[in-house]
């Protein structure tokens, strides 16, 4: 008997597909399905196997995947990753992070990364997100989302695991059984082994209903996200900081969404619920001169002068770091940023008359602005132009002996302004420890 199993259709026919291939039942069925489509082979079909190095059979699993791909004439990428045991996020999450990084590194521009999540996985994900109190998370897994240089595609979300098993047996496929899938210490395994079977006894269509709820939640989330995308730009200043007065003009529920959208837009980690609560309770009503802050996942939201700033703390610069810089080539800073001279007429950058020293602030510096006859404390000048305190600490100073010529590219002393103008140059500071991530 032939099992009814419609082949997954790629959203953009003609685009190459990279299949995440663990060797388990789900990814074996997906890869075999796609390999059975001549047109997909013509346009490009490859697989990637992640060797986490965590299981005693990891080498055997890699060999199994290599043999399968050799048998079916599929190019296989094998990515050996290092999973940190001290990341602070747990071993399972650390493995997921390493896996996604390997996928992102391998996926080429515009291509599709195909994952074999199915309807049962979707139901488990919905339950996990519901138990964690994640509202937007109830959308669970999307069929198609942007990822790295291409897209992440889940073509089996409408198929049950039972359908995949029927297909694999009919096609006489071999697959790997991972013993860790029976480890009840993992929440997902507990749901799959104990909770969902109990739900099915009472409601046989429970898995399909939960997966349908995820699709409905995704549709609703898309509508709300579209509204957030329209509202958010009006709340941001040119540096990407969030205007507190504009934010508090919205009701609390919308503020929470806008805060999360702001973090996502800046590439920050997802803002947890406790972060929203602390911002509402402590940051928004704080005094004008408050240094209130919320920290999570090596990221900070700070309040300063009626603005909220996203900030990723960096270690202080080495106290003895003060290289001489000619200006001819960019100078790489300790935080990964750089100083460079930019020509306004595209000529070759000539460099300074003599090398200048670059160092971090020590306190007590003074600077003479153009049109002034006496110097001013650098601290006061930075305050006047609205540079947040935490950014001042990582601002490079360009010095000629004891004379301060520039603080980043925000404050330039009169002699440097004259020289830059004469040579049609601009001083640029690109910081990796930016005000907004």
From Swiss-Prot:
UniProt GO cellular component terms: cytoplasm
Pfam families: ATP_bind_3, TilS, TilS_C
Keyword annotations from UniProtKB, A to Z: ATP-binding, Cytoplasm, Ligase, Nucleotide-binding, tRNA processing
GO biological process: tRNA modification
Entry's localization field: Cytoplasm
Binding site for ATP: 22-27
InterPro entries linked: Lysidine-tRNA-synth_C, Rossmann-like_a/b/a_fold, TilS/TtcA_N, tRNA_Ile_lys_synt, tRNA_Ile_lys_synt_N, tRNA_Ile_lys_synt_subst-bd
Annotated Gene3D superfamilies: 1.20.59.20, HUPs
Gene Ontology MF annotations: ATP binding; tRNA(Ile)-lysidine synthase activity
Primary location recorded for the protein, binned into one broad class: cytoplasm
E.C. numbers: 6.3.4.19
Catalytically driven reaction(s): cytidine(34) in tRNA(Ile2) + L-lysine + ATP = lysidine(34) in tRNA(Ile2) + AMP + diphosphate + H(+)
Role this protein plays: Ligates lysine onto the cytidine present at position 34 of the AUA codon-specific tRNA(Ile) that contains the anticodon CAU, in an ATP-dependent manner. Cytidine is converted to lysidine, thus changing the amino acid specificity of the tRNA from methionine to isoleucine.
Family affiliation: Belongs to the tRNA(Ile)-lysidine synthase family.
Cited PANTHER family: TRNA(ILE)-LYSIDINE SYNTHASE-RELATED
Free-text comment about domains: The N-terminal region contains the highly conserved SGGXDS motif, predicted to be a P-loop motif involved in ATP binding.
Protein name: tRNA(Ile)-lysidine synthase
């Amino acid at each position: 008997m032939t099992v009814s199993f419609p082949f997954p259709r790629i959203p953009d026919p003609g685009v190459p597909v990279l299949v995440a291939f663990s060797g388990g039942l789900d990814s074996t069925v997906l890869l075999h399905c796609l390999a059975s489509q001549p047109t997909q082979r013509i346009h490009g079909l490859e697989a990637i196997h992640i060797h986490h190095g965590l299981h005693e059979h990891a080498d055997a699993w890699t060999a199994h995947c290599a043999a399968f791909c050799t048998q079916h004439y599929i190019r296989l990428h094998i990515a050996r990753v290092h999973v940190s045991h001290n990341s602070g996020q747990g071993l399972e999450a650390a493995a997921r992070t390493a896996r996604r990084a390997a996928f992102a590194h391998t996926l080429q521009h515009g291509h599709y990364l195909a994952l074999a999540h199915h309807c049962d996985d979707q139901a488990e994900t919905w339950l996990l997100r519901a138990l964690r109190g994640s509202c937007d998370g109830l959308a669970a897994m999307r069929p198609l989302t942007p990822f790295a240089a291409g897209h992440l595609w889940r073509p089996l979300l409408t198929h049950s695991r039972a359908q995949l098993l029927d297909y694999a047996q009919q096609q006489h496929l071999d697959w790997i059984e991972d013993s860790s899938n029976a480890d009840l210490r993992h929440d997902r395994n507990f749901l799959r082994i104990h909770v969902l079977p109990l739900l099915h006894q009472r409601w046989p269509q429970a898995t399909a209903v939960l997966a349908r709820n995820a699709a409905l939640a995704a549709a609703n989330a898309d509508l709300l996200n579209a509204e957030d995308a329209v509202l958010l730009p009006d709340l941001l200043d040119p540096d990407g900081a969030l205007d507190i007065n504009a934010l508090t003009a919205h009701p609390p529920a919308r503020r929470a969404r806008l805060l999360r959208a702001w973090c996502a837009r800046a590439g920050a980690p997802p803002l947890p619920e406790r972060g929203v609560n602390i911002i509402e309770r402590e940051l928004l009503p704080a005094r004008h001169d408050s240094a209130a802050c919320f920290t999570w996942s090596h990221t900070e939201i700070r309040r300063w002068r009626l603005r909220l700033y996203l900030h990723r703390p960096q270690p202080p610069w080495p106290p003895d770091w003060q290289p001489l810089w000619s200006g001819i080539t960019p100078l790489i800073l300790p935080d990964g940023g750089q100083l460079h001279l930019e020509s306004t007429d595209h000529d070759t950058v000539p460099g300074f008359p003599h090398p200048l020293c670059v160092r971090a602030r020590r306190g007590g510096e003074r600077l003479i602005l153009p049109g002034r006859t006496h110097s001013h404390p650098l601290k006061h000048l930075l305050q006047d132009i609205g540079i947040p305190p935490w950014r001042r600490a990582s601002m490079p100073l360009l010095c000629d002996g004891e004379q301060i010529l520039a603080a980043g590219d925000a404050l330039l002393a009169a002699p440097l302004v004259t020289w830059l103008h004469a040579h049609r140059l601009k001083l640029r500071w690109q910081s990796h420890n930016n005000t907004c991530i």
